[in-house]
């Protein structure tokens, strides 16, 4: 491939991972965004989307030279919107160049004409002229600072240069220095991603105006929302150390992730064990975001789809761990988690010093503590990271990740957690995440049983179940979970999104957790009995909402 000469401001076609080439513009990255090591790359903002990324130079092509070629191979609606945004940007930039020189000439003529008409002939006229000149100077100073964000006539020139070439605008305070006129281009993009690639998330700030919005993004956002552009403020991720009332210290972090955006994947080799409802979605998102992944499952056929998508196949858990830097596992219960680590050709046989193991299974604190001890005893690093969510959230990369254990490993998993989830929390020492996950699922399982109980009570008392749902959706209990589960029940759709047998398992473990500290859990205990009845009715492999059937049989 012949070397391509590219520079700042060039329009390009950029290819990111498995996504098709997309039109973008080479721009300066934000100051706090480090350039990835390795091959030469440019920071590109993509037209028609809210994404930006570091793109390797070999994945970039000049826009105009390859325009026809790219349009032929991509016919999608969003792609066409992106191309339209490029053309609009070019049209506006061209119009700006033409009007800029015309305006400069008109300004000069107006100034000359004004001088001829304003020659002073008396003392009063001299005083008027003096006042007028003072106002003109003040306004000219303000014109350099005031660059309107709502203007549709923007080009590629800097704010300072545009202000010098255009006539003075509205009155205001003069600039203190030229630094006020230098606005990072990155402040114009809405909803940007967080993490190693983007390192921050853009959010609107109502108190500040947009100082200099990039025209093509301004055009796209207006065309989609029909609202004026607003300013976006960089918010860096923070780890917050919270001192609890008990005196113990827990480290918590809420890290926003790159939902539907671009992520710079870690250069570490990733392994993944367990391709069930949750694991399948997680692996799919890891691959989409460019991670190198080796997979294994007890059912070998489950690996085939991911091999086609670019994953590598591991023959045993031990082989996966020995060939990868960080290995994740997501299995059904404590017994499966132990067998995976301690069984024949298990994880423990592949552990070497500095090898990393992340258990994403929902298990009890004793189990995860035991696994951590045997991994660390071999020189490995351990992190527990159970996930809150369901199959759909897993597929969408919108899980909530609860992590505890090796803090450094948690940070090393950053790009992986961003690919698979919307938020991650670091909860301190091993066992904390397991306890928190069981409590979360205890609340969810109990709520689901209450929903089913309410729907059946409405039915037997002659009330409309749909009307009950409508009322609940208009009140304080309204949620996606409530609406989806009720709709599925009313439609008789119990396709598993979260297996009933697993929520019952989590209720059982949560009750045991309460017993261990002499804390009563009567609501969870009652819900657990209803789920046990549903299991007796052969509902184990249906969705948790099938607990409804325990009330009607």
Swiss-Prot record:
Phosphoserine is carried by which residues?
130, 167, 540
Complex formation: Homotetramere. Interacts with MAPK14. Interacts with KDM1B at nucleosomes; this interaction stimulates H3K4me1 and H3K4me2 demethylation. Binds to mononucleosomes. Interacts with GATA4; the interaction is required for a synergistic activation of GATA4 target genes transcription.
Kindly provide the name given to this protein in its UniProt entry: Cytokine-like nuclear factor N-PAC
One annotated Gene Ontology cellular component of this protein: nucleus
State what this protein does.
Cytokine-like nuclear factor with chromatin gene reader activity involved in chromatin modification and regulation of gene expression. Acts as a nucleosome-destabilizing factor that is recruited to genes during transcriptional activation. Recognizes and binds histone H3 without a preference for specific epigenetic markers and also binds DNA. Interacts with KDM1B and promotes its histone demethylase activity by facilitating the capture of H3 tails, they form a multifunctional enzyme complex that modifies transcribed chromatin and facilitates Pol II transcription through nucleosomes.
The entry's free-text remark on domains says: The A.T hook DNA-binding domain is required for the interaction with MAPK14.
A GO BP annotation: transcription elongation-coupled chromatin remodeling
């Amino acid at each position: 491939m012949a070397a391509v000469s590219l520079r700042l401001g060039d329009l390009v076609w950029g290819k990111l991972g498995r996504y098709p080439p997309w039109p973008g513009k080479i721009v300066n990255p934000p100051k706090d965004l480090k350039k990835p090591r390795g091959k030469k790359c440019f920071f590109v903002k993509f037209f028609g989307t809210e994404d930006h990324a570091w793109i390797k130079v070999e994945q970039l092509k000049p826009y105009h030279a390859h325009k026809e070629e790219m349009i032929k191979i991509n016919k999608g609606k969003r792609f066409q919107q992106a191309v339209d945004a490029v053309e609009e940007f070019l049209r506006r930039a061209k119009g700006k160049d033409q009007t800029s020189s015309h305006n400069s000439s008109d300004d000069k003529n107006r100034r000359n004409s004004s001088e001829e008409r304003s020659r002073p002939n008396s003392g009063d006229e001299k005083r008027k002229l003096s006042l007028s000149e003072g106002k003109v100077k003040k306004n000219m100073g303000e014109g350099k600072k005031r660059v309107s964000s709502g203007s549709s006539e923007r080009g590629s020139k800097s704010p300072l240069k545009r202000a010098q070439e255009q006539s003075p605008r509205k009155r205001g305070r003069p600039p203190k220095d030229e630094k006020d006129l230098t606005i990072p281009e990155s402040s114009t993009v809405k909803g940007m991603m967080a993490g190693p690639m983007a390192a921050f998330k853009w959010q609107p700030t109502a108190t500040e105006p947009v100082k200099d919005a990039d025209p093509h993004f301004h055009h796209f956002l207006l065309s989609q929302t029909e609202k004026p552009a607003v300013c976006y403020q960089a918010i860096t991720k923070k780890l917050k150390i919270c001192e609890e009332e008990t005196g113990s210290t827990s480290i918590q972090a809420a890290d926003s992730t790159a939902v539907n955006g671009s992520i710079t994947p870690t250069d570490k080799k990733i392994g993944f064990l367990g391709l069930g409802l949750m694991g399948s979605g997680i692996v799919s998102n890891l691959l989409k975001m460019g991670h190198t992944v080796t997979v294994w499952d007890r059912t070998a056929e489950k690996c085939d789809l991911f091999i086609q998508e670019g994953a590598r196949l591991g023959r045993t858990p031990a082989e996966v761990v020995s060939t990868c830097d960080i290995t994740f596992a997501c299995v059904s219960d404590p017994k499966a988690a132990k067998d995976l680590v301690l069984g024949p050709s298990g994880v423990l046989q592949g552990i070497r010093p500095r090898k990393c193991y992340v258990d994403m299974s929902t298990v009890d604190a004793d189990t995860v503590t035991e696994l951590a001890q045997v991994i660390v005893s071999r020189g490995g690093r351990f992190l527990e990271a159970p996930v809150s969510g369901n199959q759909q959230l897993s597929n969408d990369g919108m899980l909530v990740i609860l992590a505890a254990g090796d803090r450094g490993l948690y940070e090393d998993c950053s790009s992986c957690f961003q690919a698979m989830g919307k938020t991650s929390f670091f909860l301190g020492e091993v066992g904390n995440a397991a306890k928190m996950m069981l409590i979360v699922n205890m609340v969810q399982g109990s709520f689901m049983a209450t929903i089913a109980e309410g729907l059946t009570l409405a039915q037997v008392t002659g009330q409309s179940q749909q009307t009950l749902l409508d009322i609940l959706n208009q009140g304080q209990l309204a949620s996606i979970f409530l609406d989806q589960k009720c709709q599925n029940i009313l439609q008789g759709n119990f396709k598993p999104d979260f297996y009933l047998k697993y929520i019952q398992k989590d209720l059982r473990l949560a009750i045991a957790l309460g017993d261990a500290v002499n804390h009563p859990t009567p609501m969870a205990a009652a819900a657990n009995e209803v789920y046990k009845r549903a299991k007796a009715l052969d509902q184990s492999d249906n969705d948790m909402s099938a607990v409804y059937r325990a009330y009607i049989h």
